[in-house]
Amino acid sequence: MKIVLDTNVLVMALRSRRGASFRVLSELPTNDFQIVLTIPLYTEYQDVLSRSEVLELGYTQNDIKELTRYLASISHKQEIYYLWRPWLKDPKDDMVLEAAFASQSKYIVTYNSKDFVGKGIEESFGIKPLNAKDFLIEIGKLN
């Protein structure tokens, strides 16, 4: 099963090793799900995770580079041939949706689910937006 991780899930995983986001990353690699990456999404991961507010958590640029390279090494690389813009308010969210649609992902794991829910994504594309905790519950990894 393929999933797309919104960048905010990675930020939350770096902020706390006790939260559901860190648990999702800790499951990797797994036979239960595979993360999907596109070039724009990978670039956003690098950009956001390299910002001062993330680095101030005690990470170095090298740590971020290692994390993003690791994610790329275990991910399903997806090319985007058709842009669904504008479908959502935020073009960055459209980028996540495009990755999920093109890869036929079942889930978008995000903390901005309000930006995805009620927009016809689940009904039109069969893609369910969930936060990290609800995703882990959904796949039976958390009670």
Language-model segments: which ranges?
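Short, well-structured N-terminal submotif of metal-dependent ribonuclease cores
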Residues: M1-L37
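A secondary-structure boundary/capping signal
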Residues: D6-T7, L37-T38, N112, N131-A132
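Short, flexible helix/strand-to-coil boundary loops that buttress conserved ligand/catalytic motifs
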Residues: L14-R15, L49, G120, G140
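Short, glycine/charged-enriched secondary-structure capping and boundary segments
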Residues: R17-L25, S50-R51, E122-F125
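PIN-domain endoribonuclease scaffold, especially VapC-family toxins
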Residues: E27-L83
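Active-site neighborhoods of divalent-metal-dependent phosphate/nucleic-acid chemistry enzymes
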Residues: S73-V109
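Acidic, PIN/NYN-like endoribonuclease modules and their adjacent C-terminal/linker elements
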Residues: F101-Y107, S113-N143
